[in-house]
Amino acid sequence: MGLSDQEWQQVLTIWGKVESDLPGHGHEVLMRLFRDHPETLDRFERFKGLKTPDQMKASEDLKKHGVTVLTQLGKILKQKGNHESELKPLAQTHATKHKIPVKYLEFISEVIIKVIAEKHSADFGADSQAAMKKALELFRNDMASKYKEFGFQG
């Protein structure tokens, strides 16, 4: 299920636009994740008090965590599938400490694509979206494999 060189180029080109505003993109991704999938908020102890969109919008901690999430994902995407060294510690913390189900990784992947499509519609057409979906699916599948290595069925 690897990506072609052209698909990786599409992924990294649009990711460059995401990186131009990590706080804006990251904050929007997490707000949308919690709005569209409220059950995911239960996995974030420090954000459980954020009940309304206004509270989420005003949260600097949520914005900072959004930057962390997208920064780490960017490091993984830039490895073009050769992401073992970046992925392993992330999978370990998500499996053993945070206990984030793979389903939640699917949710955030969907949200990431929606947010990019809204913010960069002219640059994120069907081909780029398909490439990003493949890249995020590769990431999720590899996370799921690592989860099993750490004894988490996620």
Curated annotation (Swiss-Prot):
Q: Where does nitrite bind?
A: 65
- Which InterPro entries does the protein's record reference? Globin, Globin-like_sf, Myoglobin
Chief place of localization = cytoplasm
Any GO BP? removal of superoxide radicals
Q: Which PROSITE patterns match?
A: GLOBIN
Q: Provide the coiled-coil residue spans.
A: none
Listed binding positions for heme b are: 94
State where the protein is found.
Cytoplasm, Sarcoplasm
EC number(s) reported in the record: 1.7.-.-, 1.11.1.-
Q: Enumerate the GO terms in the molecular function aspect.
A: heme binding; metal ion binding; nitrite reductase activity; oxygen binding; oxygen carrier activity; peroxidase activity
Q: Which residues bind O2?
A: 65
Q: Which reaction does it catalyse?
A: Fe(III)-heme b-[protein] + nitric oxide + H2O = Fe(II)-heme b-[protein] + nitrite + 2 H(+); H2O2 + AH2 = A + 2 H2O
Superkingdom of this entry's organism? Eukaryota
Tell me where in this chain the Globin domain is found: 2-148
Which cellular component terms (GO) are annotated to the entry?
extracellular exosome; sarcoplasm
Q: Which UniProt keywords apply?
A: Cytoplasm, Heme, Iron, Metal-binding, Muscle protein, Oxidoreductase, Oxygen transport, Transport
Entry-linked PANTHER family: MYOGLOBIN
* Its job: Monomeric heme protein which primary function is to store oxygen and facilitate its diffusion within muscle tissues. Reversibly binds oxygen through a pentacoordinated heme iron and enables its timely and efficient release as needed during periods of heightened demand. Depending on the oxidative conditions of tissues and cells, and in addition to its ability to bind oxygen, it also has a nitrite reductase activity whereby it regulates the production of bioactive nitric oxide.
Q: How does it assemble?
A: Monomeric.
What family does this chain come from, according to its entry? Belongs to the globin family.
The identity of this protein, by name, is: Myoglobin
Question: Gene encoding this chain?
Answer: MB
